[in-house]
């Protein structure tokens, strides 16, 4: 009986693979079933904000953030314009004016997305990280939670800061000391704030149950 069941299972698996639908492995991303409460235009639980319903100040913010279809955190934050305005300013400083290399900015964002299992953030920023010059081997180290010993000093510290602050809820003394040596006190505050910024974004997207447009690039359950 057991041999028959095993044979039947192998036959089913063979049919699935032959049809081009191999079951996902830990290294593959798959689409989640979309819940009934998602809005079809936004891919989240919120209806889209219509530009013509906004006042002039809100329209300026809408246009500045490139909000067009209701997808993503910029659109969601428009439900609270003061939050949108203040967080836009903070994000702009941390990403573009803090002095941190663009590739390291993207690395900090990716490790945050990985530790928060934030599919939307990861799927948006993996291509941006490659464009900024972050090597695929480093991206994969973060994506698949691999050991960091092969990374450069700066990259390793940023990954360990993110893993400690979010995953372990604790950054150890050695990691902190290495971070200060490499980036200075202000740099560490900037990196920690960048991690916090995208952790907050991940929480907002989680509450909204924001789905990606197509297929997630992040393997999560």
Language model segments and positions:
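Hydrophobic alpha-helical segments
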Residues: 24-221
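Bacterial N-terminal signal peptides
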Residues: 9-19
């Amino acid at each position: 009986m057991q041999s028959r069941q095993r044979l039947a299972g192998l036959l089913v698996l063979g049919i699935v693979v032959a049809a081009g639908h191999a079951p996902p492995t830990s290294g593959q991303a798959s689409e989640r079933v979309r819940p009934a409460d998602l809005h079809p235009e936004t891919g989240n639980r919120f209806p889209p904000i219509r530009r013509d319903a906004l006042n002039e100040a809100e329209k300026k913010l809408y246009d500045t953030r490139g909000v067009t279809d209701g997808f993503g955190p910029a659109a969601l934050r428009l439900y609270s314009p003061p939050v949108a305005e203040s967080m836009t300013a903070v994000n702009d400083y941390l990403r573009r004016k803090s002095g941190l290399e663009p590739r390291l900015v993207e690395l900090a964002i990716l490790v945050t997305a990985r530790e928060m299992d934030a599919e939307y953030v990861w799927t948006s920023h993996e291509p941006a990280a490659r464009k900024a010059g972050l090597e695929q081997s480093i991206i994969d180290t973060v994506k698949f939670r691999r050991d960091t010993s092969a990374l450069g000093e700066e990259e390793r510290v940023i990954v360990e800061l993110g893993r400690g602050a979010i995953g372990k809820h604790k950054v150890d003394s050695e990691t902190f000391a290495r971070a200060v040596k490499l980036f200075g006190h202000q740099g560490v505050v900037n990196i920690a704030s960048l991690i916090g910024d995208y952790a907050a974004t991940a929480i907002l997207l989680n509450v909204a149950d924001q789905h990606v447009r197509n297929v997630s690039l992040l393997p999560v359950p």
